[in-house]
């Protein structure tokens, strides 16, 4: 997911996407623990997408306060 795509989302959409990514991260963690994880790079990608969404959400909330 690109930062430009994330910036185009509303705060509600960001919250929904963040919840979906956290669920996927949870599932990937269990797959890794049981040895069923095939796409190991997906863990890193999900982690960075979560960070990207949190960063942009914080920027948007800081922009509203200023």
Curated annotation (Swiss-Prot):
- One Gene Ontology term of the molecular function aspect: structural constituent of ribosome
Q: Which GO terms describe its cellular component?
A: cytosolic large ribosomal subunit
Cross-referenced PROSITE patterns? RIBOSOMAL_L29 (PS00579)
- Lineage: superkingdom: Bacteria
Q: Which InterPro entries match?
A: Ribosomal_protein_uL29 (IPR050063), Ribosomal_uL29 (IPR001854), Ribosomal_uL29_CS (IPR018254), Ribosomal_uL29_sf (IPR036049)
Swiss-Prot/TrEMBL GO biological process terms:
translation
- Keywords for this entry? Ribonucleoprotein, Ribosomal protein
HAMAP family per the record? Ribosomal_uL29
- Family, similarity comment: Belongs to the universal ribosomal protein uL29 family.
UniProt-recorded name of the protein: Large ribosomal subunit protein uL29
Species, as recorded: Chelativorans sp. (strain BNC1)
Q: Upper taxonomic classification of the species? A: Bacteria, Pseudomonadati, Pseudomonadota, Alphaproteobacteria, Hyphomicrobiales
């Amino acid at each position: 997911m690109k930062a430009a795509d994330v910036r185009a989302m509303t705060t509600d959409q960001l919250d929904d996407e963040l919840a979906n990514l956290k669920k996927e991260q949870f599932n990937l963690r269990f797959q890794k623990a049981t040895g069923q994880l095939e796409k190991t790079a997906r863990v890193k990608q999900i982690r960075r997408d979560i960070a990207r969404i949190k960063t942009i959400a914080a920027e948007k909330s800081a922009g509203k306060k200023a």
